[in-house]
Amino acid sequence: MTVKINYIKKITNKFAANVVFFTNEKFSINHLKKHVTNSEFNYINDLLKSSDLKKNIFVYELNSKKKIVLISAKNNLTTSDIENLGAEFYGRINYGKNSEYFINSDTVVAKYDDFLGHFLHGLKLKSYEFKKYKSKKEDRFLSINVIGNKNKPSAQTQLKFKALEEGAFFARDLVSEPGNILHPDEYAKRLISLKKNRLKVNIYDEKKLRKLGMHSLLGVGMGSVRGSYLVTIEWNGAKNNSRPLAFVGKGVTFDTGGYSLKPARFMEDMTYDMAGSAAVVGLMKSLALRKAKINAVGVVGLVENMVSGIAQRPGDIVKSYSGKTIE
């Protein structure tokens, strides 16, 4: 689903709109009187009296064109809790082809920094879908309109969360690709695209890896017709030459186990053996998009572990980059 978040001044037609309000953990709603009609207030108040207040979210359908959503912001929430609340909200309203909701930011009662920013961030992350190879693609749209003058995320906060979301979605796209598409050759090509984000990308192919003495990494990919690679991704956002933070991720695009073959019931999942590298790649993209004031380097090894006449055998001995031999 495509989610678009807009910041507007007011609702054009409050009689035919789905409106979201925040309350405290006791679902006190007196602060809503100025936002709804008397009949709507009384109706919601009566329904709450017979509701299980242990829940976080209530959706009340006032008529065929209007819903009222109440969301409880409990005390002592962490930022992860707030993001999970946004994800839960998305799960409650994620139906139908197109929909539109108005979030009244003035009703945020929780005293948390960037509460609404984290809430919307959780919603966006939950909305991720991978339908690239679906025969029938159905486009669905969700418009989230934030109204009110209080508690709106600042422009800087919006930029931060957008960068995090793009990095997360890039990583999820990589993990979701099947092994016959995202093999090491294709993976390396896609990482070159990060250069447009002002990241420095260096790709070491098999010839360079052999020269460096990285025979341990090369050994894993010996049985594949695809190449093996080491990729470094650098972000230099600090003003000084401080030592970078380093992130290393495993990028085995498919791991059969080699001659120590994986059990058949687990084999299909071995396409996810590159998820560690995807996390590193997504992180580096996010750092670049938010122009983080740090120096960082991401390192990923990209290989495919297959069975063939030239694959590495159990008991083989190779020499690693450090000079140590490994059996």
Label for each model-derived stretch:
Residues 292-327:
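A glycine- and small/hydrophobic-rich beta-loop-beta segment
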Residues 191, 245-247, 260-304:
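Alpha-helical metal-binding/catalytic segments enriched in His/Glu/Asp
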Residues 77-82, 270, 274, 327:
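Active-site pocket-shaping loop/turn-to-helix segments
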Residues 66-73, 169-173, 243-247, 253, ...:
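Glycine/charged-rich beta-loop-alpha catalytic/anionic-binding loops adjacent to active sites
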Residues 117-124, 221-224, 262-271, 313-320:
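A glycine- and small-aliphatic-rich helix-loop capping segment at beta-alpha/alpha-beta transitions
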Residues 220-224, 250-252, 256-259, 277, ...:
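Gly/Ser/Thr-rich helix-start
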